[in-house]
UniProtKB/Swiss-Prot annotation:
Enzyme Commission code(s) on record: 4.2.1.10
Name of protein: 3-dehydroquinate dehydratase
Gene (UniProt): aroD
Quaternary context: Homodimer.
PANTHER family reported for this sequence: 3-DEHYDROQUINATE DEHYDRATASE (PTHR43699:SF1)
Organism the protein comes from: Streptococcus equi subsp. zooepidemicus (strain H70)
Keywords in alphabetical order: Amino-acid biosynthesis, Aromatic amino acid biosynthesis, Lyase, Schiff base
Entry keyword Nucleus: no
Length: 226
């Protein structure tokens, strides 16, 4: 299970002052570009990609529809993604599939897609259908993050992940049940078939994230021999 940590600068000065040494034990860097004004994203990009040269980067524009900090039309969203991809070719591009279906056809040739779905309110009854629809598109990663209202919601998310991974062993999944109640799902990726777990450093990017230091300790215990 790979550890993912976010960088969330709000301006170019913050981007230039990122302490990359804090990320040495992280496998993937997620640049949450939605913390910037939309007109600043392209100009701040060089600082991010230079800071983390040689590291695997996920470019994410988390929009307000899915708990993020930026509001964009479908076309603005896809155009920004395509511009960043054309210049920097990040290892992964997050695409909010259900929020921007109307422009998904423009992403069909992208080999680095993380098709994502986030629901900060609930674990929807049609969660299995969401898994199925995104898995059929065979992106590089299927990412699902939902908010549990009960213990059963957490178990459902974990069971669906295990089931779809078993049926689609070549497909990568990154799934999590959010909040304190769902924290167990962030630790059990190796059991259920989720390839990534998202951690916090100075500031969490989603509710229920475990700190990098705690995650390292937990994984050491889980992965150690008897």
């Amino acid at each position: 299970m790979k550890i993912v940590a976010p960088v969330m600068p709000r301006n170019v000065e913050e981007a230039q002052s990122i302490d990359v040494s804090k990320y040495q034990d992280v496998n993937l860097i997620e640049w949450r570009a939605d913390f910037l004004p939309k007109e600043d994203i392209v100009s701040v990009a060089p600082a991010i990609f230079e800071k983390f040269a040689g590291r695997e980067i996920i470019f994410t524009l988390r929009t307000s529809q899915e708990g993020g900090h930026i509001t964009l039309s479908d076309q603005e969203y896809v155009d920004l993604i395509k511009e960043i991809n054309a210049i920097y070719n990040p290892d992964y591009i997050d695409f909010e599939y259900f929020s921007h279906k109307a422009v998904f056809h423009e992403m069909l040739d992208f080999p680095n897609l993380v098709l994502s779905y986030h629901n900060f309110d609930e674990t929807p009854e049609n969660l299995m259908e969401a898994f199925s629809e995104m898995t059929k598109l065979a992106p590089r990663v299927v990412k699902i993050a939902v908010m549990p209202q009960s213990e059963q919601d957490v178990l459902d998310l974990m069971n669906y992940t295990r089931g779809f991974k078993t049926l689609n062993p070549e497909q990568e999944f990154a799934t999590m049940s959010m909040g304190r109640l769902g924290r167990l799902s962030r630790l059990a990726g190796d059991v259920v078939g989720s390839s990534w777990t998202f951690v916090s450093l100075d500031q969490a990017s989603a509710p229920g994230q475990v700190s990098l230091a705690d995650m390292k300790r937990i994984l050491h215990i889980l992965e150690s021999e008897d």
